[in-house]
């Protein structure tokens, strides 16, 4: 629902907060997700914003599995969710009847290349990949991709979550 803009860039490190209005409508999915996110704020629900989910399983929905199978990678730093860290927290939050929107990612941001370098170093020393620019990516995809860093200050006020780079390694 967010993408880097004039106020939030990869370089400046200014994240998006739970209160920020969606600014990314580059695909039908993101349009629906953005409007749903705004509607969720009007109800007494727990809304956990997961991004680029990572697990320790080889699974088609696992972000690492996905990018190791892509022909080319557009490497931009993003917030990501390591599910082994976060799913137990979500259960505790539900048991406590917590409400509201939470950016449900590990603190920090990590690039696709950083993850693939770790994959190569730890899993497959022969692994290779090619990069392309965001513009080149947009030319071949039906919809654009959002890239962003989310603040986890609200989540960290409830529980400590490990930094993304520590957790992925």
Placement of each model-derived feature along the sequence:
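NAD(P)-dependent short-chain dehydrogenase/reductase
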Residues: 26, 38-85
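Residue-level signal for the nucleotide or nucleotide-sugar donor/cofactor binding architecture
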Residues: 78-81, 110, 150
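Short aromatic-enriched loop/helix-cap "lid" or pocket-rim segments at secondary-structure transitions
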Residues: 5-9, 58-62, 115-117, 141-144
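Catalytic helix-loop patch of NAD(P)-dependent Rossmann-fold dehydrogenases
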Residues: 2-48, 55
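C-terminal amphipathic/interface module of NAD(P)-dependent oxidoreductases
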Residues: 125-127, 141-169
């Amino acid at each position: 629902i967010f993408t880097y803009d004039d106020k939030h860039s990869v370089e400046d490190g200014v994240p998006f907060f739970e209160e920020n209005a969606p600014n990314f409508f580059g695909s039908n999915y993101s349009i629906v997700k953005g409007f749903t996110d705004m509607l969720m704020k009007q109800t007494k629900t727990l809304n956990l914003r997961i991004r680029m989910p990572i697990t320790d399983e080889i699974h088609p929905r696992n972000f690492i599995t996905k990018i190791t199978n892509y022909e080319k990678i557009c490497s931009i730093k993003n917030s990501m969710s390591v599910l082994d860290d976060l799913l137990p927290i979500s259960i505790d939050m539900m048991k406590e009847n917590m409400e509201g929107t939470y950016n449900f990612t590990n603190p920090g941001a990590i690039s696709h290349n950083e993850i693939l370098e770790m994959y190569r170093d730890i899993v497959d020393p022969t692994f290779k990949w090619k990069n392309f620019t965001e513009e080149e990516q947009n030319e071949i995809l039906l919809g654009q991709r959002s890239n962003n860093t989310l603040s986890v200050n609200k989540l960290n006020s409830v529980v400590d979550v490990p930094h993304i780079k520590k957790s992925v390694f």
